[in-house]
Curated annotation (Swiss-Prot):
InterPro entries: NADH_UbQ_OxRdtase-like_20kDa, NADH_UQ_OxRdtase_20Kd_su. Binds 1 [4Fe-4S] cluster. The keyword Thylakoid applies. GO terms for cellular component: chloroplast thylakoid membrane; respiratory chain complex I. NCBIfam families: nuoB_fam, PRK06411.1. It is a peripheral membrane protein. This is NAD(P)H-quinone oxidoreductase subunit K, chloroplastic. NDH shuttles electrons from NAD(P)H:plastoquinone, via FMN and iron-sulfur (Fe-S) centers, to quinones in the photosynthetic chain and possibly in a chloroplast respiratory chain. The immediate electron acceptor for the enzyme in this species is believed to be plastoquinone. Couples the redox reaction to proton translocation, and thus conserves the redox energy in a proton gradient. Its main location: plastid. The keyword Disulfide bond does not apply. Its cofactor is [4Fe-4S] cluster. HAMAP family: NDH1_NuoB.
Length: 225
């Protein structure tokens, strides 16, 4: 409709009123005030610390780091996650209020990185523990890449429906932390054999809660998950 047909008062009223939905208003307020819980365990977190300076100035995105998970709606995992850390990470995630989001930063967080081939204590991807919204690969990712990941998360928040988000998180709370260990042949024989890296275990599984109980009895073997 042509604005000339309206009177001056009507045009002023039209320009001063914003029509929207409660869902869009909620999304706008949440994407403009993301409060992250920083879970840095390795060198990737040093790159995130660069964002605090004036060069990148992450305050312009409304990011306010919090020390308590009950005050955060975003957890940013950066670095290697071991099985000993897994229960603590899941507990922190569960203490965050809904809706909540996760950014997995760095190769070690996403796949286990260089520790994924021969380490028995490294989690092969944090998405085995908690649902991840944005994956940020790199070793380590640059600060510009972190800003891009935050921008993608903001776009995701702006398009989502609040009821669907709550329903999805109730159905997919988190993944199990009961890792299973397999007893395999020792690789420390002095001879390099790449086939051992991909050899399937032929013995029975050892549950994680009994690992330390039987650690001395399987010290001559390698444990791989």
């Amino acid at each position: 409709m042509n604005s000339i047909e309206f009177t001056l008062l009507a045009r002023r009223t039209q320009n001063s009123v914003i029509s929207t939905t409660s869902n869009d208003l909620s999304n706008w307020s949440r994407l403009s005030s993301l409060w992250p819980l920083l879970y840095g365990t390795s060198c990737c977190f040093i790159e995130f610390a660069s964002l605090i300076g004036s060069r990148f100035d992450f305050d312009r995105y409304g990011l306010v780091p919090r020390s308590s998970p009950r005050q955060a709606d975003l957890i940013l995992t950066a670095g290697t996650v071991t099985m000993k850390m897994a229960p603590s990470l899941v507990r922190l995630y569960e203490q965050m209020p809904e809706p909540k989001y996760v950014i997995a930063m760095g190769a070690c967080t996403i796949t286990g990185g260089m520790f994924s081939t021969d380490s028995y204590s490294t989690v092969r991807g944090v998405d085995k523990l908690i649902p991840v919204d944005v994956y940020l690969p790199g070793c380590p990712p640059k600060p510009e890449a972190i800003i891009d990941a935050i921008t993608k998360l903001r776009k995701k928040i702006s398009r989502e429906i609040y009821e669907d988000r709550i329903r999805s998180q109730e159905e997919n709370r988190c993944f199990t932390t009961n890792h299973k260990f397999h007893v395999g042949p020792s690789m420390h024989t002095g001879n390099y054999d790449p086939g051992l890296l991909y050899q399937l275990p032929s013995t029975s599984e050892i549950a994680s809660e009994t690992f330390f109980k039987y650690k001395s009895s399987v010290s001559a073997h390698e444990l791989v998950n």
